[in-house]
Amino acid sequence: MTSIEPTHTGKKVIVGMSGGVDSSVSAYLLMQQGYQVEGLFMKNWEEDDNNEYCAAAEDLKDAQAVCDKLGIKLHTVNFAAEYWDNVFEYFLAEYKAGRTPNPDIMCNKEIKFKAFLEFADEILDADYIAMGHYVRRRDNSDGSTQMLRGVDGNKDQSYFLYTLSHEQVARSLFPVGELEKHQVREIAKEMGLITHDKKDSTGICFIGERKFTEFLRTYLPAQPGNIETPEGEVIGTHQGLMYHTLGQRKGLGIGGMKNSNDDPWYVVDKDLERNVLIVGQGGHHPRLMSTGMTVNQLHWVDRTGPVDGCHITVKTRYRQQDVPCTLTYTDEHTLRVVFDEPVAAVTPGQSAVFYDGEVCLGGGIIDQLIRG
């Protein structure tokens, strides 16, 4: 492998070591670039069962093994209280209100790039922090810093980082954002890092491998109600609207209906007032399609957002193809977004993230859907 000429001698970077391959290679690449690198392992959740405890202990063990191999220090910090207050309680409140939140986005905002950065600054005297996220930063000649999509389009994580401020991006380094995932694994293998073939973590960190509905039932009591067709026919019952999201197909328990065709059933709407789950047949059912949406709680990475009436692109969920759209501000905190073509399963509570080419501009929370 070609060595990288050190260019940043003396600058101190604290790398968020998760025990995975991406953070492992991030630490290695930054050392190659001449940074003074130390690791920091975050504990964000107090495990409530043996399996979760074992997984967290395994991650810490792997992070320590990588740091030992690289010859760098590994610090540990417990952010479980901050996570509970700023991420988990928000997650529960949104589900209780019938929306579908994205706790990973809130975790990045409140923990990985806020609590972590503050700890790295105040306790470890960092110049920068670094994470194993697949995004890039661009430093412009006018002194501004922008966040760009990762080179690996399949792994790009800018959707999860749109809440970062200009200042947070300027203090953060994203070495693996310049690489494809297979290159990251190759570097890890070549360097003899224990994480080179470790499976990527999936799902919400505090749920782990458990079934989502079982986990949610621990914190939110079931609220059974009817399942209806758009015409009002009752065809089943649900245990709680919070267990279902728009576009969901599995786990409805209503197959083989009389007088229905063979198309699968999808959740097409939720009637919060009546506690009714509305389902329709086919992935492009009219009730599942939106021509636009309103978006609030806006956040722009470079503080000034796109101009009124501009035509850019948006993602309404992770790994979605960009959707061309036109933006209109209804006030400084709310956008009306009209899609060029109707989009399926746009979900209130999820994030809408806007792009101008490679640049992630920022985004907000999907509030209301526009249909027809």
From Swiss-Prot:
Q: For the site Interaction with tRNA, which positions are given?
A: H133, Q350
Q: Where is this region: Interaction with target base in tRNA?
A: 102-104
**Entry binding sites for ATP:** G16, M17, S18, G19, G20, V21, D22, S23, M42, G132
Catalytic function, reaction form: S-sulfanyl-L-cysteinyl-[protein] + uridine(34) in tRNA + AH2 + ATP = 2-thiouridine(34) in tRNA + L-cysteinyl-[protein] + A + AMP + diphosphate + H(+)
Q: Which CDD domains match?
A: MnmA_TRMU-like
Gene3D superfamilies, per the entry: Adenine nucleotide alpha hydrolases-like domains, HUPs, Translation factors
| SUPFAM superfamilies, per the entry | Adenine nucleotide alpha hydrolases-like (SSF52402)
Q: Which InterPro entries match?
A: MnmA-like, MnmA-like_C, MnmA-like_central, MnmA-like_central_sf, Rossmann-like_a/b/a_fold
Query: What does the entry give for GO biological process?
Result: tRNA wobble position uridine thiolation
Top-rank EC class of the record's enzyme? transferase
Q: GO: which molecular function terms?
A: ATP binding; tRNA binding; tRNA-uridine 2-sulfurtransferase activity
As for subcellular location, the record says: Cytoplasm
Name the segments for region: Interaction with tRNA: 155-157, 317-318
Pfam families listed in its UniProt record: tRNA_Me_trans, tRNA_Me_trans_C, tRNA_Me_trans_M
Q: Which UniProt keywords apply?
A: ATP-binding, Cytoplasm, Disulfide bond, Nucleotide-binding, RNA-binding, Transferase, tRNA processing, tRNA-binding
GO CC aspect terms:
cytoplasm
Catalytic site = C107, C205
Q: Look up the EC number in the record and give it.
A: 2.8.1.13
Q: List the disulfide bonds.
A: C107-C205
Sequence similarity: Belongs to the MnmA/TRMU family.
Write out the function statement from the record: Catalyzes the 2-thiolation of uridine at the wobble position (U34) of tRNA, leading to the formation of s(2)U34.
Specify the protein name: tRNA-specific 2-thiouridylase MnmA
Q: Which organism is it from?
A: Shewanella putrefaciens (strain CN-32 / ATCC BAA-453)
